[in-house]
């Protein structure tokens, strides 16, 4: 069973976290989605990085960690996938994953380009 974790600055009052989970389950109903935190202070990448760094190692290898903090996709702000310590991290390219990988070299880093393909 795949484990997917979420760290967001969305809070829990609105539909945003439920929409992410619904999208995940609609595409992969066997996934197990775990909220690490949805209460990160808005746009606070340092807080998100701190939470992530202290939580991800508690999950099994090959877990997928989605960090949706300060993540509006624009031409200037790309999204990336990083393989680190046998875990997968998905985030905006806003410094969160750079903070996480200060002491461990990532195995791979990819830019997510799926939106460019969908826009064609």
Regions found by a protein language model. Give the residues of each.
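Extreme N-terminal starter segment of soluble prokaryotic enzymes
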Residues: 1-5
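Glycine-rich phosphate/diphosphate-binding loop of Rossmann-like nucleotide-binding domains
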Residues: 17
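Short helix-loop-beta junction
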Residues: 23-31
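Active-site histidine-anchored catalytic micro-motif
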Residues: 27, 39, 43-48, 54, ...
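A short beta-strand-loop structural module common to alpha/beta enzyme folds
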Residues: 32-40
């Amino acid at each position: 069973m795949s484990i997917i974790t979420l760290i967001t600055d969305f809070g829990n009052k609105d539909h945003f976290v439920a929409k992410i989970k619904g999208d995940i389950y609609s595409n992969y109903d066997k996934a197990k989605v775990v909220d690490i935190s949805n209460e990160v202070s808005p746009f606070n990448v340092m807080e998100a990085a701190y939470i992530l760094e202290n939580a991800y190692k508690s999950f099994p290898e090959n877990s997928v960690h989605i960090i949706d903090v300060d993540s509006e996709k624009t031409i200037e702000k790309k999204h990336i996938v990083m393989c680190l310590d046998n875990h997968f991290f998905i985030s905006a390219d806003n410094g969160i994953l750079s903070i996480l990988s200060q002491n461990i070299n990532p195995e791979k880093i990819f830019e997510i380009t799926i939106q460019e393909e969908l826009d064609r």
